[in-house]
């Protein structure tokens, strides 16, 4: 995906660097060349060695320590909205711990807490569309009543741009869109988009917590 971005930038404006995100020497060298670091690394599902704790907690801990060591101007860290209430979710726990590590390690950090970020080909929409295409039913945890305020990726980029340009002094920013929508409503919109009908099975709160 990074190489697609390069085709949309002026020649010499964007450099794509491939690296293991726990390669300390390479990260330190990259931080030497920048004044602002933006951490957008995250996963929705664990797979093989890509574990929530490793990606959402350990890496932000490392990056924020190196950012402090290199005395960069600002570290912008993408966390997630509502993770404080999700005490039974490995995803949420790892995100919150990573956020706290960044705050502790680097005082000039800015924490962005977006709701669902959507765009063409985003992971959230693509993953659920794939599931809806393959499965004859869709479980609705917490009965599908969980509320979201999805934000379009261009609006999130504008927030980041304003921070980079020094137009915001907030330390933590909740990033939400104009519409509040339930998880069930999101699934219904996706079903309409792919022209499918599926059995939606509400999973009550006490069952989801088991």
Say what each PLM segment does.
Residues 11-14, 129-142, 201:
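A short C-terminal helix-loop "cap" of Rossmann-like NAD(P)-dependent dehydrogenase/epimerase domains
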Residues 123-124, 143-165, 171, 183-185:
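Substrate-positioning beta->alpha
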Residues 163-210:
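Mid/C-terminal beta-alpha module of Rossmann-like enzyme folds, strongest
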């Amino acid at each position: 995906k990074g190489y697609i971005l390069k085709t949309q930038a002026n020649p010499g404006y964007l450099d794509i660097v491939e690296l293991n995100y726990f390669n300390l020497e390479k990260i330190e060298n990259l931080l030497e060349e920048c004044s602002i670091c933006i951490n957008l690394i995250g996963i929705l599902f664990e797979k093989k060695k890509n574990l929530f704790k490793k990606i959402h907690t350990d890496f932000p801990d490392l990056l924020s320590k190196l950012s402090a060591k290199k005395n960069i101007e600002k570290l912008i860290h993408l966390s997630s909205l509502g993770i404080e209430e999700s005490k039974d979710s490995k995803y949420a726990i790892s995100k919150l711990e990573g956020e706290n590590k960044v705050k502790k390690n680097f005082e000039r950090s800015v924490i962005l807490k977006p709701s669902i970020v959507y765009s063409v080909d985003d992971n959230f929409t693509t993953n659920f569309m794939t599931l809806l295409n393959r499965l004859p039913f869709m479980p609705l945890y917490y009965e599908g009543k969980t509320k979201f305020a999805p934000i379009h990726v261009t609006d999130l980029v504008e927030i980041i741009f304003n921070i980079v340009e020094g137009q915001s002094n907030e330390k933590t920013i909740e990033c939400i869109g104009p519409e509040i929508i339930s998880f069930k409503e999101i699934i219904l919109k996706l079903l309409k988009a792919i022209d499918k009908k599926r059995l939606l099975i509400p999973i009550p709160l006490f069952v989801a917590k088991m």
